[in-house]
Curated annotation (Swiss-Prot):
Subcellular location: Cytoplasm
Similarity field: Belongs to the RecA family.
Role of this protein: Can catalyze the hydrolysis of ATP in the presence of single-stranded DNA, the ATP-dependent uptake of single-stranded DNA by duplex DNA, and the ATP-dependent hybridization of homologous single-stranded DNAs. It interacts with LexA causing its activation and leading to its autocatalytic cleavage.
Pfam families hit by this protein: RecA (PF00154), RecA_C (PF21096)
Molecular function GO terms recorded: ATP binding; ATP hydrolysis activity; ATP-dependent DNA damage sensor activity; damaged DNA binding; single-stranded DNA binding
GO CC annotation terms, alphabetical: cytosol
One Gene Ontology term from the biological process aspect of the record: SOS response
Binding site residues for ATP: G68, P69, E70, S71, S72, G73, K74, T75
Full protein name: Protein RecA
Amino acid sequence: MAPQAHDRDKALDLALAQIDKNFGKGSVMRLGEGVRQPIAVIPTGSISLDVALGIGGLPRGRVVEIYGPESSGKTTVALHAVANAQAAGGIAAFIDAEHALDPDYAQKLGVDTDALLVSQPDTGEQALEIADMLIRSGALDILVVDSVAALVPRAEIEGEMGDSHVGLQARLMSQALRKMTGALSNSGTTAIFINQLREKIGVMFGSPETTTGGKALKFYSSVRLDVRRIETLKDGTDAVGNRTRVKVVKNKVAPPFKQAEFDILYGQGISKEGSLIDMGVEHGFIRKSGSWYTYEGDQLGQGKENARKFLLENTDIRDEIEKKIKEKLGIGADVTAAATDDAAPVEF
């Protein structure tokens, strides 16, 4: 005979009391208890990408994977997130497994290179152990691993060139992510894993592209970003940057599959002003007539490049446009200011 509702409630209360006693108060809670807080985020540096992510940036306390072809802008996006975290008073770490970090370029993107924690590990085990220890310190706001493909297991480094090491890297990533995810949530650290693309042999239907490091990173990531270069930006005959498209292929904190486009300028990174012009035109704050851009009767310039330079020089107008866009779309500092470490986000 099934137990009565009263008996079930009493049994549940006893079990919850015992769990709280053994593991601490709040180990189990009802999702509807208390006020739900917004998810704390780190802005990406592109307002269009912040909008595509649905919450105004990369979620704190989660795993994020950024992947794409070579020279598509993966590290640039990650470094902009680092710069924004530091600008808000946060501490950032960069695990440079590729041994290819350019401090001068990072500085141009706004990264405080003097305060940035950098490690250039010898093996994949060393890289992930360092990352885990930094996360468990509870002091870190953002951690970047560049890249997963360069996390070479110790056995492969110490072995001969022709030796087979099937599945070693995948097992290493799986074990590391099992350990890290809980610590990330507790510390509120955002872990960004930059990944490369490979092609599967013999695929007849569907995309042959796949990422390195096995399937664990796909499962543990709350956000996965596919970064592609779609166009070369030119000033006359000189190439000055790339038009970049980012697709949010996985998103556990907002609806997925949204896309964002923005400009990455050589030596400057993501053009914040270019993103504001694109979003301003899309949402009616900036008027485009022919090749002219106007804002509330004021001419910003003829052509996007001139309008971008105008906003670069007139930061008050730029900030005003940014504020209006964020208010309309419900993203930004005002919305995420109330976010706390114990926020309970809804997962999609």
